[in-house]
Amino acid sequence: MSISKISLIDFNDTKLRKDDSAKTISYFCKIRPVKIDSSVVSELRDISELNKGANVRICLHDSPLSKHHDMVILERKDKYYRPHKHKDKGEAFHIIDGKMAIFIFDEDGSILDSTVLLQGDIYRIEENQYHSVMPVTNIVIYHENKPGPFLGDKDSVFPSWAPDGNNYNKTQNYISYLNSYIK
């Protein structure tokens, strides 16, 4: 038996802590080392389905205050991911399953780069760079890493040129605009 093995379905509170205050279903790993294998990736899908298609993440770090954040994240195509930037944090994405578009914007909202990441692809974003992700497949699962700590509402800066998601028509028009850049 491996001490690094975790399970979301056979939940063990000595290995994982569920964060009920998070915006998405989130778990923090309490053990070191920690191993994420294909069975855990499959459990991400199961947890999402059991929760009406919710996004789910496993944080490989033990707390929002950790100096380095590693997360395995499941996101769904039917949701809006507002462009944002992190003032002093770069980040990297590594696709585990599915496809995901990434958009990089200048300060005025013009698209500087758009690309579709496939399974195994890696993409790094510099600090203070507006960006957005958009799942291309119904579900995308990826590994994201960036510096901590998580600063709550101060962690991300949202631009005025991107809809906040509260107006359905504006949001759908913006999503259609971004979709026109996906090749």
Residue locations for each model-derived region?
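Anionic, Ser/Thr-rich low-complexity intrinsically disordered regions
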Residues: 155-158, 164-168
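Conserved short histidine dyad/triad with adjacent acidic residue
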Residues: 71-87
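Short, surface-exposed charged micro-motifs
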Residues: 72, 92, 132
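A short hydrophobic beta-strand segment most commonly corresponding to one strand
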Residues: 92, 137-156
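Short acidic-glycine-tyrosine-enriched beta hairpin
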Residues: 106-128
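Short beta-strand His + acidic residue motifs that chelate non-heme Fe in jelly-roll/DSBH
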Residues: 82-83, 102-104, 123-125, 131-136, ...
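Glycine- and acidic-residue-biased ligand/ion/polar-headgroup-sensing regions
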Residues: 76-77, 88-106
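A short, N-terminal "cap"/entry segment at the start of jelly-roll beta-barrel domains
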Residues: 1-68, 115, 161, 170-183
